[in-house]
């Protein structure tokens, strides 16, 4: 019998993703935190009235963090 350790990322009682590595689970959780903050920021803009689109855009930006940092000049190409 094998023992398998799984790390579950959960938000508001809902299972979002399961990982076998704690580092991967932590990275995903951090990305979700960033998406939550971006969602709040996008909501303040009133450019996107559809919350679903705000959520999709926030998730896209969080998933593409490195490219976003380059685009806004917070990080330089080496």
Where are these regions (language model features)?
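Short, charge-rich amphipathic interface segments used for partner binding and complex assembly
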Residues: 47-78
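Generic structural hydrophobic/aromatic packing signal, biased to beta-strands
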Residues: 7-9, 38, 61
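Short aromatic-glycine-(Arg/Gly/Cys) micro-motifs in beta-strand/loop hairpins
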Residues: 1-14
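Charged/polar low-complexity intrinsically disordered segments, enriched in acidic residues
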Residues: 33-54
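Short active-site loop/helix that positions an aromatic residue
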Residues: 24-33
């Amino acid at each position: 019998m094998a023992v398998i350790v799984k790390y579950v990322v959960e938000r508001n009682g809902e299972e979002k993703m399961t990982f076998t590595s704690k580092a991967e689970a932590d990275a995903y959780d951090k990305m979700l935190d960033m998406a939550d903050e971006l969602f709040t920021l996008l909501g303040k803009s009133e450019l996107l009235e559809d919350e679903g689109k705000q959520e999709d855009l926030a998730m896209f930006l969080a998933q593409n963090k490195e490219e976003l940092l380059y685009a806004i000049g917070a990080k330089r190409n080496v």
